[in-house]
């Protein structure tokens, strides 16, 4: 990639390490202040051994090489995506002790172990988003031997109803179903109660009419078939997102076009799955900054950054978390937070998998198990279609 080549040229050709130091300190100062960096201010803060004139000369060279750009209003310099990449590559993850304690306290909101694995991962993403004050997404495989524990029906209008199906592992499946006719008042609630009793193997309500029971069975079988279709045949990991509105607090995303680019990328399942899977076996955070996202996003210059890190069960990667933000992220703190977060999550997931004997499978566009052993996959979902005689 062109960006990587330019950086390697900087490393290979630098005759004076002070140029590199000026770049790192200018980027650091910009991240701290959010303002263009002038030579005098940099001299007063981090480069007292260099004169303003020398710093300006270094600025000019860095600007020529594409690492800094001049602010036409103040005359100060602003780091480019290449500068942020260089900074991210040359600074180890770092957290103050107070930050570590605060994060550890926040992580106590997560359970020690749980069978409700998907719900817990969703909770973990909420906690991470709250810690970083950034949008978070994560990919997840499909967990085997799941079972439906609740069914809800919500009327949209006279002929359509939303069917909400939730599972023991925390999966939520929704779909829209058409009703053959308008139902009397409270009829939908009675059908919902009948289906919930059926799941729990409890006696049905005597107030339910035969017509309502028959309709409930038809709706149940329809939604189960749709659920099993999605469960058995999936070509991408399940993807979950939270905290998108947190982008609005950053100056970069107050520009509608930049905000639209960032959200469009985060909402694109194909792009996000591709990005999250890129370094699935790398246990440390990976940053994709600015133009490095171009090949995936498809536009000219997404002015944002995505940082990913896989999460593990023992030594096996299950998926990855991704954080979306502006290019001027505090990379050291974000890297440190992600590492601390996934270390804790690894302990929770490992305990949960061994305690409850959980298993999972990954997506495949042409999963041979889906075509050769559909009955086995259907059984592992713990959802069974009603026998035909129960529909009569």
UniProtKB/Swiss-Prot annotation:
One of its GO terms (biological process) is negative regulation of DNA-templated transcription. The keyword Repressor applies. One of its GO terms (molecular function) is DNA binding. Keywords: Repressor, Stress response, Transcription, Transcription regulation. SUPFAM superfamilies: GAF domain-like, Winged helix' DNA-binding domain. InterPro entries: GAF-like_dom_sf, HrcA, HrcA_C, WH-like_DNA-bd_sf, WH_DNA-bd_sf. It comes from the Bacteria. PANTHER family: HEAT-INDUCIBLE TRANSCRIPTION REPRESSOR HRCA (PTHR34824:SF1). Negative regulator of class I heat shock genes (grpE-dnaK-dnaJ and groELS operons). Prevents heat-shock induction of these operons. Belongs to the HrcA family. This is Heat-inducible transcription repressor HrcA. The lineage of its organism: Bacteria, Pseudomonadati, Chlamydiota, Chlamydiia, Chlamydiales.
């Amino acid at each position: 990639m062109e960006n990587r080549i330019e950086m390697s040229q900087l490393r290979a050709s630098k005759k004076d390490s002070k140029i590199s130091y000026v770049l790192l300190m200018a980027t650091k100062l910009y991240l701290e202040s959010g303002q263009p960096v002038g030579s005098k201010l940099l001299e007063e803060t981090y480069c007292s051994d260099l004169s303003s004139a020398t710093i300006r000369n270094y600025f000019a060279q860095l600007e020529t090489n594409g690492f800094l750009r001049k602010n036409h209003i103040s005359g100060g310099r602003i780091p480019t995506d290449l500068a942020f990449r260089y900074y991210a590559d040359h600074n180890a993850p770092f957290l103050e002790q107070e930050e570590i304690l605060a994060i550890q306290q926040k992580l106590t909101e997560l359970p020690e172990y749980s069978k409700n694995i998907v719900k817990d991962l969703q909770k973990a993403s909420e906690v991470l988003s709250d810690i970083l004050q950034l949008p978070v997404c994560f990919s997840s495989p499909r967990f085997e031997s799941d079972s439906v524990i609740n069914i809800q029906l919500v009327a949209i209008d006279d002929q359509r109803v939303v069917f909400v199906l939730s599972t023991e592992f925390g999966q939520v499946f929704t779909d829209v179903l058409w009703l053959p006719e308008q139902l009397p008042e409270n009829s939908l609630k009675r059908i919902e109660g009948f289906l919930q009793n059926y799941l729990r193997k409890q006696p049905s309500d005597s107030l339910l009419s035969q017509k309502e029971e028959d309709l409930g069975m038809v709706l149940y079988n329809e939604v189960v078939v749709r659920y099993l279709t999605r469960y058995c045949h999936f070509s991408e990991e399940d993807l979950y997102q939270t905290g998108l509105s947190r982008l609005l607090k950053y100056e970069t995303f107050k520009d509608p076009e930049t905000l639209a680019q960032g959200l469009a990328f985060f909402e694109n399942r194909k792009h996000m799955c591709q990005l999250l899977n890129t370094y699935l076996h790398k246990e440390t955070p990976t940053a994709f900054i600015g133009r490095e996202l171009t090949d995936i996003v498809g536009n000219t210059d997404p002015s944002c950054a995505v940082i990913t890190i896989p999460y593990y069960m023992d030594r096996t990667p299950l998926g990855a978390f991704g954080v979306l933000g502006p290019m001027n992220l505090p990379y050291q703190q974000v890297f440190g937070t992600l590492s601390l977060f996934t270390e804790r999550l690894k302990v929770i997931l490992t305990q949960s998998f061994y305690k409850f004997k959980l298993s999972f499978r990954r997506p495949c566009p042409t999963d041979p198990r889906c075509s050769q052993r559909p009955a086995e996959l259907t059984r592992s979902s713990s959802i069974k279609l009603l026998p035909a005689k129960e529909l009569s």
